[in-house]
C-alpha cells in the first residue's frame, strides 16, 4: 500500500500550487490543521471534557429528563437503581425546577453521566473534496461519491454533532472507500427481558430478568470500488458516534488517527438532550477477543511532527515536513499494556434494603419521572391503549408545583393518577410506611348499574342489596368520579371495582347513605371493623347442583379460598364424572400455577395464550420475546362434557389466563359479565420515598393472536344480578348457566 503521508504531502503541495483554484482548496488546507495533544491527555479521567454534544430536543424538558434517567437507571455503567434515583430527587427538589440546572446537578452526582450544553449544529449534507490524489470526506446526509482517481482518503470527524443520522453517515463514508467489510467492536451492555422485579430476588422462575453480555455489531458494509488508505482527523471533543467510529476503525487497523486522542468512554456513551443542556450517558464497554479496549486510543500523529502547535488549527504543514514522514502499510496494533479502568455495566438486583418512607416535592417529581421512564421502556400496551403518558407527566408535575408535597399519600395519589392513563388493571401504587387504616368497612361490594351494591356484610344495619349512595355527605357519583380518575383499569367493570375498593379503608367512623331494595335511603354510622371482608362472589363448594333443581349437573368453584390446590381440583373433577354438564366458576381468583386443570378439561391438544415480553439488547435494540405452546390433554380424571364458564368484572389476571385457554379452545360457553381485560406478569418498580408501582410487563394475546387487553373474556350470554337478587342471596349467573346446560338456550 502506498504511504498515505506521501499522498497527503503530494496533495498539500498540489493544493499550494493551486490556491487560486478557489474555496475547496482553502477548506482542505484549513481542515488539515490540528493541535498537539500531549500524553497527559491520555488519562481516562474527565472523559466528559472530550465529548461533543448534539442538538436539543422538541420534547418537554421533564419528558426528556425522564428518558435520560431511564437510560442511566436501566442501561448505565454507573450506580444502581437507588443511588441514581436519589440523585434525581436531589436535582428536582424545590418549589419549582430549573431543568437545565437540574440536568447539571444530576450529572454531577451520577458516575458515567456528563452534562453538556446542547449544540445548534445539525448534520449537513456530505461533502467530498478532491485535491490531487486525496479525497477529503466530511460525513453527512446523502451518498458519498469518491473520485475514481483518489489514492487516499481523509475523513474529518471534528465538530460533527451528536445528531440523528450521524452513525449512518459515518458508515457511508468508510463504505465508499472499502472493498471488504470493516469489523466493528462488540459492546458489553445490559440486556433486559422485561423489567426485572425490584422487590423480589430473581430466580430461575422469574418472568423478567436482566443480564450483561457482549452485543455484536454488524461490520461496516463495503460499497467502494477500491480499498483506499484512510486517515481520520480527530479534534479535542467528538460526538459519541464519531468517537465510536474512530475506535472501531483504529482497533481494526483500518485507519490512522491524526489530531487528538480518542477517549473510549465517549464512544460508549449516548447523547440525551434535555433542554438547553443534555447528557452523555455511558451505557457500554467496547471489547474485542482480547477483552476491553484501551481507555484512550492515542493518535498516530498529533501533527506536532509537522510543525504545528496548540492553537494552530488554521495552519498547514509544510510539504517538506509531510515528505519526511512515511507511514506505509497498515497501522500498527494499538498498545494494550496499560490496564483498563473503565467499568462495564453490571447486572441489576432487587434492593436488599428498601427505601424509607419519606415525602417531598423532589421525591414526588423524581418518582413521576422514574415511573414515566420505566413505562416508556417496558409497558407493552401503548399500541392498544394509546400513548398519553407525556401529557399526564406534565399534568402531575404542575400539581406538584402548585401544592408542595409533604406526606406520602400525596405522592401515592399523584402516581395513581399517572398510572390511570395506562388503562392497565395491574396499575396499582403502594405507599410503604404510610399510615395504617383505623379499620375497614366490612362489606363485599358488587357493581350494578354503575353503583356499589352490598353483596355480603358483617356490619350491623348494612344488608345485602343495599346500594351505597353517599359517604360522609359526599354523593357516591361524585366520590366515584374522583376515585375512578385515580384508578387504572382496562375495562369499565374493573375500573369501578378498583375505585370502590377504596371505600373499604376507614380512618374513623363514617356515615354511609344506603338505599334499600324498598327504595328508601337511610344513613348509617359505621364503626371501622378489624378485618376486611374478602373472597370471591360465591363461596359455594364443588358438588352437585341438585339443590338448585339440577342433580344431573355439577359445579366447581376455582377461587383459591374454595379450591386451593391441584389435588383438590382432581378430587372435585373425579366427583363430577357422569354429570351431563359442568359449571366452572372463575369469578374469583384461582391458585393454580400449572396447566394441569386445563389439560383435564380440554380433551384435545390446545394452544396456550401468546406471551410477548419486551426485550432490550442494550439501549438501542428493542424487540419481543414471544412464547406460545401446544399442550396435550390429560385423563383420569377428566371431563369431556359441556361446560359453562362463569366470569365477571372481578375475574382478573390468573382467572382470565385460565379462561383465555378455555375460550381459545372453544371448550366453554361463557355466562356472566365481561372480565377485567388484564393479564400478564406484573412489573414492580421501587422508588424513593418507599413508593412501589405496578404495571403489566408483558403483552398477552388470545391463542388465535387476537387482542385481549381491554377486551377480556366477553360472555356469550350476559347475566347481571339486581339488588333484589343480592338481597335474596340469589346467584343469577349460576342459575342462567344451569338454564343453558339444561335447555341449550
Report each predicted region and the residues it spans:
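Flexible, low-complexity junctional segments that flank or bridge functional domains
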Residues: 38-240, 244-592, 596-599, 603-612, ...
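Flexible, glycine-rich surface segments
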Residues: 242-245, 632, 642, 646, ...
Amino acid at each position: 500500500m502506498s504511504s498515505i503521508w506521501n499522498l497527503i504531502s503530494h496533495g498539500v503541495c498540489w493544493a499550494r500550487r493551486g490556491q487560486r483554484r478557489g474555496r475547496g482548496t482553502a477548506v482542505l488546507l484549513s481542515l488539515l490543521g490540528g493541535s498537539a495533544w500531549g500524553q497527559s491527555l491520555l488519562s481516562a479521567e474527565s472523559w466528559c471534557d472530550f465529548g461533543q454534544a448534539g442538538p436539543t430536543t422538541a420534547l418537554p424538558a421533564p419528558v426528556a429528563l425522564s428518558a435520560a434517567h431511564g437510560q442511566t437507571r436501566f442501561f448505565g455503567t454507573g450506580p444502581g437503581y437507588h443511588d441514581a434515583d436519589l440523585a434525581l430527587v436531589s436535582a428536582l427538589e424545590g418549589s419549582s425546577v430549573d431543568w437545565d440546572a437540574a440536568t447539571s446537578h444530576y450529572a454531577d452526582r451520577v458516575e458515567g453521566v456528563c452534562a453538556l450544553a446542547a449544540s445548534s449544529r445539525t448534520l449537513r449534507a456530505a461533502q467530498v473534496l478532491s485535491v490531487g490524489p486525496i479525497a477529503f470526506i466530511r460525513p453527512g446526509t446523502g451518498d458519498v461519491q469518491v473520485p475514481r482517481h483518489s489514492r487516499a482518503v481523509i475523513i474529518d470527524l471534528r465538530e460533527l454533532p451528536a445528531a440523528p443520522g450521524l452513525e449512518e453517515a459515518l458508515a457511508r463514508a468508510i463504505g465508499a472507500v472499502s472493498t471488504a467489510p470493516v469489523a466493528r467492536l462488540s459492546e458489553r451492555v445490559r440486556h433486559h427481558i422485561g423489567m426485572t422485579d425490584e422487590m423480589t430476588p430473581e430466580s430461575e422462575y422469574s418472568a423478567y430478568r436482566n443480564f450483561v453480555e457482549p452485543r455484536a455489531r454488524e461490520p461496516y458494509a463495503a460499497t467502494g470500488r477500491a480499498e483506499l488508505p484512510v486517515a481520520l482527523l480527530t479534534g479535542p471533543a467528538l460526538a459519541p458516534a464519531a468517537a465510536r467510529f474512530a475506535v472501531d476503525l483504529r482497533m481494526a487497523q483500518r485507519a490512522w488517527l491524526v489530531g487528538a486522542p480518542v477517549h473510549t468512554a465517549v464512544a460508549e456513551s449516548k447523547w440525551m438532550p434535555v433542554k438547553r443542556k443534555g447528557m452523555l450517558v455511558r451505557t457500554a464497554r467496547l471489547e474485542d477477543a482480547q477483552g476491553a479496549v484501551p481507555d484512550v486510543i492515542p493518535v498516530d500523529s498529533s501533527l506536532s511532527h509537522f510543525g504545528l502547535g496548540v492553537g494552530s488549527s488554521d495552519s498547514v504543514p509544510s510539504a517538506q515536513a509531510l515528505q519526511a514522514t512515511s507511514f506505509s502499510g497498515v497501522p500498527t496494533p494499538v498498545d494494550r499494556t496499560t490496564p483498563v479502568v473503565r467499568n462495564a455495566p453490571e447486572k441489576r438486583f432487587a434492593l436488599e434494603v428498601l427505601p424509607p418512607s419519606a415525602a417531598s416535592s423532589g421525591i414526588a417529581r423524581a418518582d413521576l419521572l422514574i415511573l414515566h421512564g420505566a413505562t416508556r421502556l417496558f409497558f407493552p400496551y401503548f399500541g392498544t391503549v394509546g400513548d398519553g403518558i407525556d401529557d399526564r407527566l406534565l399534568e402531575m408535575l404542575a400539581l406538584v408545583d402548585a401544592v408542595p408535597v409533604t406526606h406520602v399519600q400525596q405522592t401515592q395519589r399523584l402516581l395513581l393518577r399517572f398510572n390511570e392513563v395506562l388503562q392497565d388493571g395491574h396499575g396499582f401504587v403502594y405507599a410503604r410506611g404510610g399510615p395504617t387504616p383505623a379499620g375497614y368497612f366490612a362489606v363485599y361490594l358488587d357493581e350494578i348499574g354503575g353503583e356499589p351494591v352490598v353483596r355480603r356484610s358483617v356490619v350491623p344495619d348494612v344488608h345485602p342489596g343495599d346500594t351505597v349512595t353517599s359517604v360522609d355527605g359526599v354523593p357516591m357519583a361524585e366520590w366515584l368520579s374522583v376515585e375512578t380518575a385515580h384508578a387504572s383499569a382496562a375495562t369499565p367493570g374493573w375500573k369501578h371495582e378498583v375505585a370502590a375498593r377504596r371505600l373499604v379503608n376507614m380512618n374513623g367512623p363514617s356515615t354511609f347513605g344506603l338505599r334499600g331494595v324498598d327504595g328508601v335511603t337511610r344513613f348509617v354510622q359505621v364503626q371501622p371493623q378489624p378485618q376486611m371482608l374478602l373472597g370471591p362472589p360465591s363461596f359455594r363448594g364443588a358438588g352437585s347442583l341438585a339443590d338448585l333443581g339440577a342433580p344431573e349437573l355439577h359445579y366447581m368453584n376455582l377461587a383459591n379460598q374454595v379450591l386451593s390446590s391441584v389435588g383438590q381440583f382432581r378430587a372435585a373433577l373425579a366427583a363430577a364424572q357422569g354429570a351431563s354438564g359442568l359449571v366452572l366458576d372463575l369469578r374469583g381468583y384461582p391458585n393454580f400455577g400449572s396447566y394441569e386443570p386445563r389439560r383435564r378439561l380440554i380433551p384435545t391438544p390446545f394452544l396456550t395464550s401468546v406471551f410477548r415480553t419486551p426485550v432490550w439488547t442494550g439501549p438501542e435494540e428493542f424487540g419481543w420475546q414471544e412464547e406460545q405452546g401446544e399442550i396435550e390433554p390429560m385423563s383420569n380424571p377428566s371431563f369431556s362434557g359441556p361446560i359453562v364458564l362463569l366470569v365477571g368484572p372481578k375475574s382478573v389476571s390468573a382467572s382470565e389466563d385460565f379462561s383465555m385457554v378455555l375460550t381459545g379452545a372453544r371448550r366453554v360457553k361463557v355466562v356472566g359479565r365481561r372480565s377485567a381485560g388484564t393479564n400478564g406478569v406484573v412489573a414492580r418498580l421501587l422508588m424513593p420515598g418507599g413508593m412501589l408501582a405496578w404495571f403489566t410487563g408483558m403483552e398477552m394475546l388470545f391463542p388465535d393472536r387476537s387482542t385481549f387487553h381491554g377486551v377480556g373474556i366477553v360472555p356469550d350470554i350476559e347475566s347481571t344480578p339486581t339488588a333484589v337478587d343480592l338481597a335474596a342471596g340469589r346467584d343469577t349467573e349460576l342459575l342462567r348457566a344451569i338454564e343453558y346446560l339444561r335447555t341449550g338456550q
